[in-house]
């Protein structure tokens, strides 16, 4: 699609892992070979991108630190967005949500959406790739969902098993 054609379209993309690429590989959000960059996004009439703080299973034991690092990356790289570009912050994988106060603090830092798992079980819920179809939300997971509803954080169910 050429630039003139793109100027006619508005995009709302609900997921990308670009924050991990920027954080881990030292890439620039301005222009990169990751999922999206500001240069490509600014070619559209309007572009809203949801940036995921993806908590890979290798970070399971330090999920909160990883979530905070990616949140910091988001804020560092989205301070001066082009006028037609909007950025939304999400969490993909609830390993960093170790308490309701942590959840509320992520919300205060701008997290608007959270996926409770990423395919595998954690302390909040069972994941999409798990065979235990009867597990669903844990007791803590139920309190997390209730708190998310209370504070207005959207629940992404795409990687849950039930």
Q: How should each PLM-predicted stretch be described?
A:
Residues 1, 100-108, 130-162:
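Histidine/acidic residue-rich metal-binding segments in metalloenzymes
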Residues 1-133:
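N-terminal hydrophobic targeting/anchoring segments and the immediately downstream early-domain regions
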